[in-house]
Structures are given as C-alpha cells and as structure tokens.
C-alpha cells in the first residue's frame, strides 16, 4: 500500500491575495495549509490548518510541556543543525507527538534521511519545510520513502501545480475527441523526446498545435514489426507544437532539451514529471491531424510512421497510420486563452487556425 503524503501550502501575501489563492488551492486538490485559522475568517473551507493555535486542526505546540488540546493532532516544530537535534526530535516524538515539523537550513538531504530512518517505525508523521518546487521533489523522494508532508512556502498557484506533479497528485481533464481530418503535409522537422524515465503503457505527452487542445501522444513502449520498444521515448510532433510543463506553462517542442522537465500523463489525466535526457530533431514525412471535442477544434502535425500512436477512450492504442475520420482519441482541451511566453493570459482574445 502506497504511503499517503500531503503537500501543505504556507501562503504568503496580503489578505486579498489569500482570498484569491485559497479557492484555487481547493480546486487543485490541496487539503492542508500552514496558516493561522483566524485568517480564514468565516469562510467555509475544506482546508485543514496546521499552526501554533488551538483552533488549528493540527496544533503546533510551542513548548514541550504545553497542554495538549483534546481531539486535535499535536506536534512540535524543530530546527535541525546537528545530530544532537535529530536525537532530540526522536526523544520528544516518542512521548506522543502525532507529527513533527522539521526545518533544515543547510545539508537538507542527509539530516532528513537520518530523521526518516529513525521515525519510520513509529507513528509520528514528518512534515518538512520547503521553499522551491525542486526542494519539494527532493523531500518526497528521500530514501524512496520520503517525508509524510512538505510545508511549501509559496503564493504562486503555478508553483503549487508544479509541486503537485512531483507528489503525483496533479491531474488534467481528459476527454474524447473525434478525428475530423487527416492529411499528408510533406516533410517537416519533428521532435523525439527521450526521457530519463521508463514510461508505461497508456502514458504519453500532451502535444498540439494549439495550447488549449493537446493530444495524448503515446510513448514507444510497444515498438513495431520494424523497431524494438523504446519505453523512454515519445515521438512527440513537429517543432512548432506545444507541450505542457510541470508548472502549467507551455513550451514549443523546439525548446525541449537535455535537462528540461516534461509532463507524462495517462488517459485518466494523472500526471507525473520526467527529465529529458535527449531531444532529437530530424526531418521526416508528416501528417496533419485535426479533431473536435465539444465546441473546440484542434490539430497536431506528427510524423507519418506506425510507431506514433494516440490513446483511445477504452485505453487501446491507435497508430496515426491506421487512424480514420470518425475515430476517437483522448485529448486535453478547454476554451482558448492567450499565452505570453508560455503563461496563460485569461482575458486576452485569441483565434488560432
């Protein structure tokens, strides 16, 4: 059974910024925040609070001998500077703490490895403090067990989304789209994205000629009668196509390179991140494919080869060389908005053809 882990957001900014951010956090599936419950006011929310307050759901005790409020989870916050601090955490945790909040200012990995190893066998949860999405990723992967929760100091919803990909809880709305046009368009430059991860059947990248209409392009884990499986690769599409990044912004496929991070999704929309090991741009015969989902129409230009596959609503794969008008494939689509350097601009008018 997989370990339950939480991304706990510690929002920064004014009350007005907070009022805007909290509903967004709920929409993204965040369940816990590190915040004084007083700042929630009388607003109804499902968000649970962690804070040095008896009104919080998870009460951070400020003194070791403080009275424990009934019916609440209780913990302590610790700053770790040496192994002595780690031993102190273990001693106090054994006295009945439900959780510990750990802040390590330098050499984060080794101290947290030691804390996880020592607290792993007791029922005290470990919440670690992070300041960047990259720190969130490291803390969730330490010793392959990771901490139970990461308190992430941010007021950026894009950073929250990026961190959720590292947690493995980010998801995208996927829907079936009907193929309405297929046409050979001659040669063009296409991009093969070789990741540093093994990709599973059903997984791929979101690719499209429009940022609001992206096709799920499957990886090459299946192979063909002429090629061996390459389960790390996605033959993504033409250089102009968009793909989504973990932070929610878009990149052109021509911008993807060694060290870039890309989103890997399955047909249900569950996302994880992968690091790019290599990006290959080569000239190949290309196909233009258009599809319609609801009132939106989008397209993609992909290589004309049997190893490029889309995913059907039933999970089956279909090669672009066998694709027909009327077939349905999985896409991520939404109403069109403008983009400025990859960032969504919600009020800008845009028409793409």
Swiss-Prot record:
Catalysed transformations (reactions): 2-amino-2,3,7-trideoxy-D-lyxo-hept-6-ulosonate + NAD(+) + H2O = 3-dehydroquinate + NH4(+) + NADH + H(+)
Keyword annotations from UniProtKB, A to Z: Amino-acid biosynthesis, Aromatic amino acid biosynthesis, NAD, Oxidoreductase
GO BP terms, alphabetized: amino acid biosynthetic process; aromatic amino acid family biosynthetic process
Pfam hit, one: DHQS
Role, per record: Catalyzes the oxidative deamination and cyclization of 2-amino-3,7-dideoxy-D-threo-hept-6-ulosonic acid (ADH) to yield 3-dehydroquinate (DHQ), which is fed into the canonical shikimic pathway of aromatic amino acid biosynthesis.
Family: Belongs to the archaeal-type DHQ synthase family.
Record's protein name: 3-dehydroquinate synthase
Organism of provenance: Nitrosopumilus maritimus (strain SCM1)
Recorded name of the encoding gene: aroB'
């Amino acid at each position: 059974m997989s370990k339950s882990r939480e991304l706990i957001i510690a929002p920064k900014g004014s009350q007005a910024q907070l009022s805007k951010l909290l509903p967004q956090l709920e929409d993204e599936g965040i369940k816990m925040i590190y915040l004084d419950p007083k700042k929630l006011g009388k607003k109804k929310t499902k968000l649970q609070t962690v804070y040095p307050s008896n009104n919080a759901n998870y009460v951070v005790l400020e003194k070791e001998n403080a009275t424990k409020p009934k019916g609440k989870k209780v913990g302590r916050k610790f700053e770790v500077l040496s192994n002595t601090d780690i031993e102190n955490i273990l001693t106090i945790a054994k006295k009945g703490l439900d959780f510990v909040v750990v802040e390590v200012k330098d050499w984060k990995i080794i101290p947290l490895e030691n804390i996880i190893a020592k607290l792993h066998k007791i029922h005290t949860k470990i919440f670690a403090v992070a300041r960047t999405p990259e720190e969130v990723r490291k803390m969730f992967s330490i010793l392959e067990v990771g901490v139970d929760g990461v308190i992430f100091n941010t007021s950026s919803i894009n950073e929250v989304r990026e961190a959720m990909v590292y947690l493995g809880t980010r998801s995208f709305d996927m829907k079936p789209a009907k193929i309405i046009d297929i046409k050979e368009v001659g040669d063009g430059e296409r991009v093969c994205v070789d990741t540093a991860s093994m990709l599973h059947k059903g997984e791929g990248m979101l690719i499209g000629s429009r940022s609001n209409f992206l096709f799920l392009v499957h990886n090459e884990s299946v192979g063909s009668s002429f090629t061996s499986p390459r389960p790390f690769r996605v033959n993504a599409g033409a250089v102009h196509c968009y793909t989504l990044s973990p932070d929610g912004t878009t990149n052109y496929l021509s911008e993807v390179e060694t060290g870039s991070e890309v989103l890997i999704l399955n047909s249900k929309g569950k996302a994880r991140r992968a690091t790019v090991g290599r990006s290959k741009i080569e000239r190949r015969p290309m196909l233009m494919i258009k599809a319609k989902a609801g009132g939106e129409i989008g397209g993609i230009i992909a290589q004309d080869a049997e190893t490029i596959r889309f995913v059907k609503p039933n999970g089956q794969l279909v090669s672009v060389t066998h694709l027909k008008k009327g077939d349905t494939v999985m896409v991520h689509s939404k109403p069109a908005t403008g983009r400025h350097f990859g960032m969504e601009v919600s009020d800008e008018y845009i028409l793409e053809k």
